[in-house]
Every structure is written in structure tokens, then in C-alpha cells.
Amino acid sequence: MVGMGISQIQPEHMGAPAAKYAHAVKVDGAQSMVFTSGVVPTMPDGTVPPSLEGQTRVVWANLLEILRASQMGVTNIVSITTYVVASDTLTADLATVMAVRDEVMADHRAASTLVTVPALARAEWLIEISLVAAS
């Protein structure tokens, strides 16, 4: 089988993405795919950081652990869906979430959707992320 390729789809007749993501991602020749559930900000000891930034970092650490367990890394991510609890500080909250995502993703771009929601399954959770990765 020919090696896998991940390419960004950025149609010239569309505006540029609003942040550091791709409008779409095409995966050719994938041998393995990982679809995560919504990953939440619970640390191994069961605690949840109080701040959105702390929670976002825990979620990404958990996602990276899933990728490592699947013999994959950030460059295998093809799609991200992020849910953030809406608040009075939404603009700053979204900037925080995107800054952590950009730090983790570095120069890699994936298809990405960010959705604000009134609440998640537990009151202390402020963020939940699911992703798709391919190798």
C-alpha cells in the first residue's frame, strides 16, 4: 500500500479560515483511524482544574495520550470538534482555547469546529474535545 497522505483543502473561491485550521482535510491511503469520544478535563486523580486554560491543557494532554497509545501524534489529527461552555467572558475564553490548541498543533492544520454550549455533562467541565486521526 502506498503511504498515507494528509492534505489541506483550501478552495480558492472560499475565504481563508477564520483561525489556524483547514476548511477540510483529505486523507489518502490511511491504514488506521482513531475516533475519540468527547475528551473531558478530568486528571488521572479525578480532579478538574478550575480555570478554562487549565482544563484545556488537561484535555489536550489526554488527547495526546490517546494518540500515543495509538502510535500516532499531532500530525495525524485530521478533524477536531471543540465544545466550550458559553460565559460572560466568551471572547476571552475562545481566545484561550484557540491559543492552547495552536500551541499543541504548532504548524499542523486539521479541519476544526468550535461550538459554544450552555453546559456539558458535569457542571465543573468547561470544555470537551473530540478528534479524528489517521495514519
Label for each model-derived stretch:
Residues 2-135:
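Short, polar/acidic, helix-capping and beta-turn segments at strand->helix junctions
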